[in-house]
Regions:
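Tubulin/FtsZ superfamily GTPase core signature
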Residues: 1-220
Length: 220
């Protein structure tokens, strides 16, 4: 685990990007310089982590070469790093947001395990994820479906953004711009959910209300 910077401010919320897509979104969010938030990047690909803007990075696995689009490979690599994952929560944040893009290997296989470890430590854990475009193929959709089930079991709440819906709304745009729209929308959703806790004096009360809200939703 690599820490690029330290802070004396106790984080209210920890935002963890998992996989290349999740880390791209966290890179966007981290530029907002929100006080009291801790940003983490987790990936099997060392090159992705080198480009991360997150203060803390955690390489999953040992070869630094990525998952090869295999959720199972990512799952095994992440299970081997559970001790390091637990250390991410030593600062005892009130909430964890696990941000990922489902359908690939690392995000699909690793994100549920990271959410599980956060939840086991008594931290309110929320997952936010994008779903693949139809043109990405049946395999990615199948892997995304498995990822949804695993995330739902390991988080208090799971928010999904359908990339295909984004494509249909922006059908005149090239696919790379449609991807950018999806990233920006999930970024705004994430920021909106955590913005309610940015005022330190009201953070405890608001966090308690959000915990109660998720319990009533029965999203587990």
């Amino acid at each position: 685990m690599n820490k690029k910077a330290t802070s004396t401010i106790k984080p209210i919320v920890k935002v963890i990007g998992v996989g290349c897509g999740g880390n791209n979104i966290v890179n966007h969010i981290s530029t907002s310089h929100l006080e009291g938030f801790s940003f983490v990047a987790c990936d099997m690909d060392a090159k992705v982590l080198e480009k991360s803007a997150a203060a803390t990075t955690l390489q999953l696995g040992t070869d630094g070469l990525g998952s090869g689009n295999s959720p199972e490979k990512a799952r095994v690599a992440t299970e081997e790093k559970t001790d390091a994952i637990k250390q991410l929560f030593n600062d005892k944040p009130s909430m964890t947001f696990v941000v990922t893009c489902l359908g690939g290997g690392c995000g699909t296989g690793a994100a549920p395990i990271i959410a599980r470890e956060s939840k086991k430590m008594g931290i309110t854990t929320v997952a936010l994820a994008t779903l693949p475009f139809e043109l990405e193929g049946e395999r990615r959709f199948s892997q995304a479906s498995e990822g949804i089930q695993n995330l739902a079991r390991n988080a208090e709440a799971l928010f999904l953004l359908n990339n295909q819906y984004i494509k249909e709304q922006y059908c005149d745009l090239p696919i790379n711009q449609a991807f950018a729209k999806a990233d920006n929308l999930l970024m705004e959703v994430t920021k909106s959910l955590i913005r309610a806790m940015t005022k330190p004096k009201q953070a405890t009360k608001r966090t308690s209300r959000i915990k109660e809200f998720f319990k009533r939703l029965k999203c587990k």
